[in-house]
Amino acid sequence: MATEEDVKQRQIIESRARNISHNVRCTECGSQSIEDSQADIAILLRKLIRDEIKSGKSDKEIYKKLQADYGETILYTPKFDLQTAAIWLSPVIVGGVAAGVWAYQKHRQRTNVHIMALNLVRGVPLTPREKETMLDVLTPPPPANKWWWPGK
């Protein structure tokens, strides 16, 4: 008959095994954890995890062994390194560059119109007030709607 200590020990092993199994991806199913999968490889991995726990290994050691044997994709939470950072940050960087190019083009377009207006009145003998009036007439007004969405 099992003692109370043996029952507690089995419960601890089972709890740790389930916790680890929920964080390990089934290599056949891909979208399921090995805890939820009934594939042969998932059953074998669950047994391997329980054996490793019984032999006294820590969770971290078990994760490292699984990662070494099956690759980084077996874990649902891969380590965060330079490559992972590049993958996650690339959309933000591309969006920032696109916004910068768009803003530069808008600024350049406004500046070019002002420079063309100055070039038109450059050689003409005008008083400062006439020159200012000509620039006001030749320079287009800023757009009335500054929001990208018309309802604002």
From Swiss-Prot:
Heme binds at residues 26, 29. It comes from the Eukaryota. Pfam families: CcmH. One of its GO terms (cellular component) is mitochondrial inner membrane. GO terms for biological process: cytochrome complex assembly; embryo development ending in seed dormancy. Plays a role in mitochondrial cytochrome c maturation. Probable component of a heme lyase complex involved in the reduction of apocytochrome c. This is Cytochrome c-type biogenesis CcmH-like mitochondrial protein. It comes from Oryza sativa subsp. japonica.
